[in-house]
Regions:
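Short, low-complexity N-terminal regulatory "tails/caps" that precede and couple sensory modules
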Residues: 1-35
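Short loop/turn elements at sensory-signaling interfaces that couple input to output
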Residues: 9-11, 148-163, 170-176
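PAS-family sensory domain signal
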Residues: 33-90, 185-193
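PAS-family sensory domains
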Residues: 79-148, 215
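Regulatory hinge/linker segments at domain boundaries
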Residues: 184-207
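Short alpha-helical "packing" element that flanks the helix-turn-helix/winged-helix DNA-binding module
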Residues: 208-215
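Recognition helix of helix-turn-helix DNA-binding domains
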Residues: 218-246
């Protein structure tokens, strides 16, 4: 079902902006300062703003987690020790099967290809955004998730080797996955990649596709009604039809 929870959305945006500021700051730091940044990142995992999120630090050279917050168990049923032992391979166990296939076969390769064309300075400014579903391997509960991640440091050849990320329960749930790549330029952002993969077997009308695009941007039904010069009731009817098709 497509829905919006404004309070939770504001909380996510506030935490994400704090994370972005941290990442912007390390772009000008010396290598020896990275360790203190990572320790600060870990400490934020237990504060009130991030208690309902998963924060992680991933070593991109050996694809092992250097840190994962304890809240990972509530989302996935897995304990931090499982993440440390299995590394990135654990994703196939905690992400819904069809989502994992779409991410690994389509979105990840395309997003990485875009980023490899960027300069080192631009890579420091990259923010990845992913929408998918986690599945708790103990309870079977499926949770829509939005994940934001960025590169934290690079080796001498300009290759990223440390990535930090945050996962939240998403305020938007749809039958598919989405991947975005943005460049953080001060107060402005440029989206350089945005693709959504739907699993629907039904054909959406042009109006329904437009409404989905608005919803993915975080617009509410009143805003959509005003922009498209239709009644709020019509927007709600479209959303019900979209839900049935998805």
């Amino acid at each position: 079902m497509l829905y919006l929870t404004i309070g939770k959305e504001k909380l996510i945006k506030a935490s994400l902006e704090a994370h972005r500021k941290e990442l912007r700051a390390i772009a000008s730091q010396k290598e020896q300062d990275i360790a203190s940044f990572l320790e600060s990142f870990k400490s934020h995992a237990i504060d009130g703003l991030n208690i309902n999120s998963i924060r992680y630090i991933l070593n991109l050279q050996d694809l092992k987690y250097e840190f994962i917050s304890n809240s990972c168990t509530a989302f996935t049923g897995m304990k931090p020790v499982d993440f440390y032992g299995k590394g990135l391979q654990i994703l196939s166990e905690i992400i819904l099967g069809k989502d994992f296939n779409a991410l690994s076969k389509d979105l990840f390769p395309a997003m990485n290809a875009i980023v490899q064309e960027l300069s080192l300075k631009e890579k420091y400014a990259v923010v990845f955004e992913l929408h998918y579903h986690m599945q708790n391997n103990r309870t079977g509960k499926i949770t829509p998730v939005v994940e934001y991640s960025s590169y934290a440091d690079f080796d001498d050849q300009g290759r990223p080797y440390i990535s930090t990320g945050i996962c939240y329960e998403s305020v938007l749930d749809f039958n598919g996955v989405r991947g975005l790549v943005r460049l953080n330029r001060g107060e402005e952002q440029e989206t350089i990649y945005d693709r959504t993969i739907y699993y629907s077997i039904y054909v959406l009308t042009p109006s329904e596709k437009k409404i989905i695009a608005y919803l993915l941007e975080g617009k509410d039904y009143k805003w959509i009604a005003s922009t498209e010069f239709i009644s709020p009731h019509t927007v709600k009817t479209h959303i019900k039809n979209i839900y049935k098709k998805l």
